[in-house]
């Protein structure tokens, strides 16, 4: 029977690759590279660097897909501990960039440990809860939340409010999908609402408060705090239906738009490709998210279901936060557009998370045989 299956298909199956998810990731990466080339001002150096990032990302994804989920259950505590130690090292010997100490420079490589933590936190929480009867007990829920808060606080003091929110959200999605009590969710929401004034007065930095106030009235300081948002909205709005054309955007090409290759690359896409480009982008993202949710629903274990579901939901949050930020409906928090913005650590970390998804999906037959 196996002889009747085409050779290329047999190779594909043995590599433990989910075809549809692979196609979605390839499509969003290709579109992102097209826009990035324009956003960088046709910089061959940046484009070549992106090619290396993409190759490394796909290699990491493919490698992670080869190992069964039980392998990640075993290494999760070590990965969590490594991420935690790296965050401490950032505070001690980290490299400062744009007023924030977020990077580790080892000479041969420079990376953000917070990106590793985005993967390690939901994995560790999923292992902890997935090995216990669900829904979790109250004590187990509090232990899981403590696992989330420790690295979140270390990221927040860098300071990196946007990433700290995403790290906490990635872990909380796991707790929620594990069956967290609705009463506890309500209590958490009320507690968070009460904590906001304290955070505003004592924990947030001046520039973070300025970003929130700027969101409410960016025109108040058009050449200062409101500059980013206003230029981004001008770029998106001027794109119209079909855009101004590839590499024809005035806001990006004339350097009015800040950070066009990272946080504000969506504005470049909107200006040059218009509403049509936006719909294409959203269709690809939706395709990836739906495929991820399908993998979560069809997973054979509690660990697989809650981890795949949380990974997919946090990917959606990345997309939502970046587009909301660039469109002026959310504060600017420095969250890149996933798999689209320039940035090696972020790209590889997200591809690694999709490698986990492929592992959960393509190795599920092993669980069925054991059961």
Swiss-Prot record:
Source lineage: Bacteria, Pseudomonadati, Pseudomonadota, Gammaproteobacteria, Pasteurellales
Species of origin: Haemophilus influenzae (strain ATCC 51907 / DSM 11121 / KW20 / Rd)
Keyword Glycosyltransferase among record annotations: yes
Location (main, coarse): membrane
The EC number(s) this enzyme carries: 2.4.99.28
Reactions catalysed, as given in the entry: [GlcNAc-(1->4)-Mur2Ac(oyl-L-Ala-gamma-D-Glu-L-Lys-D-Ala-D-Ala)](n)-di-trans,octa-cis-undecaprenyl diphosphate + beta-D-GlcNAc-(1->4)-Mur2Ac(oyl-L-Ala-gamma-D-Glu-L-Lys-D-Ala-D-Ala)-di-trans,octa-cis-undecaprenyl diphosphate = [GlcNAc-(1->4)-Mur2Ac(oyl-L-Ala-gamma-D-Glu-L-Lys-D-Ala-D-Ala)](n+1)-di-trans,octa-cis-undecaprenyl diphosphate + di-trans,octa-cis-undecaprenyl diphosphate + H(+)
Keywords linked to the UniProt accession: Cell inner membrane, Cell membrane, Cell shape, Cell wall biogenesis/degradation, Glycosyltransferase, Membrane, Peptidoglycan synthesis, Transferase, Transmembrane, Transmembrane helix
Family, as annotated: Belongs to the SEDS family. MrdB/RodA subfamily.
Record has Cell membrane as a keyword: yes
Protein name: Peptidoglycan glycosyltransferase MrdB
Cellular component terms per the entry's GO annotation: cell division site; plasma membrane
Superkingdom per UniProt: Bacteria
InterPro entries assigned to the protein according to its UniProt record, in alphabetical order: Cell_cycle_FtsW-rel_CS, FtsW/RodA, RodA/MrdB
Role, per record: Peptidoglycan polymerase that is essential for cell wall elongation.
Cellular localisation: Cell inner membrane
Membrane topology: Multi-pass membrane protein
Transmembrane segments: 17-37, 51-71, 75-95, 111-131, 142-162, 172-192, 275-295, 313-333, 337-357
């Amino acid at each position: 029977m196996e002889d009747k299956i085409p050779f290329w298909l047999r190779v594909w199956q043995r590599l433990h690759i989910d075809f549809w998810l692979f196609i979605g990731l390839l499509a969003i990466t290709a579109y992102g590279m097209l826009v990035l080339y324009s956003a960088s001002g046709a910089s061959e150096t940046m484009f070549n660097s992106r090619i290396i990032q993409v190759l490394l990302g796909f290699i990491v994804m493919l490698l992670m897909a080869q190992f069964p989920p039980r392998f990640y259950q075993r290494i999760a505590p070590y990965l969590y501990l490594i991420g935690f130690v790296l965050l401490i090292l950032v505070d001690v010997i980290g490299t400062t960039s744009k007023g924030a100490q977020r990077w580790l420079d080892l000479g041969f490589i420079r990376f953000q440990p917070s990106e590793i933590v985005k993967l390690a936190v939901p994995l560790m929480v999923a292992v902890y809860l997935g090995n216990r009867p669900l829904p979790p007990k109250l004590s187990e829920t509090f232990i899981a939340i403590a696992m989330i808060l420790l690295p979140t606080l270390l990221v927040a003091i860098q300071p990196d409010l946007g990433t700290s929110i995403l790290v906490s959200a990635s872990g909380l999605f796991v707790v929620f999908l594990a069956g967290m009590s609705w009463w506890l969710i309500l209590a958490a929401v009320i507690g968070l609402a009460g904590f906001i004034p304290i955070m505003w007065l004592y924990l947030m930095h001046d520039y973070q408060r300025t970003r929130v106030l700027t969101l409410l009235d960016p025109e108040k300081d058009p050449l200062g705090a409101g500059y980013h948002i206003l230029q981004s909205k001008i770029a998106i709005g001027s794109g119209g239906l079909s855009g101004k054309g590839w590499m024809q955007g005035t806001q990006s090409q004339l350097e009015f738009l800040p950070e066009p290759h990272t946080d504000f690359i969506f504005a470049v896409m909107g200006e040059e490709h218009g509403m049509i480009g936006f719909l294409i982008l959203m269709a690809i993202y939706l395709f990836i998210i739906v495929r991820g949710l399908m993998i979560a629903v069809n997973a054979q274990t509690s660990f697989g279901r809650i981890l795949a579901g949380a990974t997919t939901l946090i990917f959606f949050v990345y997309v939502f936060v970046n587009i909301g930020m660039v469109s002026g409906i959310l504060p600017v928090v420095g969250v890149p557009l996933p798999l689209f913005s320039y940035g090696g650590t972020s790209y590889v970390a997200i591809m690694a998370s999709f490698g986990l998804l492929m592992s959960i999906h393509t190795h599920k037959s092993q669980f069925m045989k054991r059961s």
